């Protein structure tokens, strides 16, 4: 198994650098020949979404479709495949960042009863509670 960094996926999906995109295509053709031969960790997915949103101005719907495609690719292995799917569902259903959705899902998987936050958009999602002072 070989791990890939965010920029590998950015080049592959945006094709914004022809030379690097060609290298990435060769890597995928060579190493993505059997199930789970390329490893994508959680941070790579979070960074990819951030880069596509901020740097390339992709819309949320485009990003969600792309992440679904990545998560459905048999030749990719993931750090937390199930949690990435759950975070994607939260990202689609609520007005929150994918990173927040993933934080909530990871914490729930780690048996946290809630995730405290001051982020008012994150509290719209499951697993989050507004942190406040108790008297």
Regions found by a protein language model. Name each.
Residues 1, 104-135:
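Acidic, PIN/NYN-like endoribonuclease modules and their adjacent C-terminal/linker elements
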Residues 1-40, 55-60, 133-135:
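Short, well-structured N-terminal submotif of metal-dependent ribonuclease cores
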Residues 5, 47, 100, 119:
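Acidic active-site catalytic centers that drive phospho-/nucleotidyl reactions
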Residues 9, 45, 122-123:
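A generic structural signal for short hydrophobic patches within well-formed alpha-helices
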Residues 41-44, 83:
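Short, conserved alpha-helical segments within structured domains
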Residues 57-71, 75:
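Glycine/small-residue-rich phosphate/adenosyl-binding loop
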Residues 75-118:
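Active-site neighborhoods of divalent-metal-dependent phosphate/nucleic-acid chemistry enzymes
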């Amino acid at each position: 198994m070989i791990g890939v960094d965010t920029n590998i996926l950015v080049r592959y999906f945006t094709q914004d650098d022809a030379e690097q995109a060609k290298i990435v295509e060769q890597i995928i053709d060579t190493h993505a020949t059997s199930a789970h031969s390329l490893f994508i960790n959680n941070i790579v997915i979070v960074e990819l979404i951030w880069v596509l949103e901020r740097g390339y101005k992709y819309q949320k719907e485009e990003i969600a479709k792309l992440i679904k495609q990545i998560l459905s690719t048999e030749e990719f292995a993931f750090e937390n495949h199930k949690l990435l799917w759950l975070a994607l569902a939260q990202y689609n259903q609520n007005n929150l960042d994918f990173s927040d959705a993933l934080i909530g899902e990871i914490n729930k998987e780690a048996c946290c009863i809630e995730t405290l936050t001051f982020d008012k958009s994150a509290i719209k999602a499951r697993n989050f509670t507004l942190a406040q002072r108790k008297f």
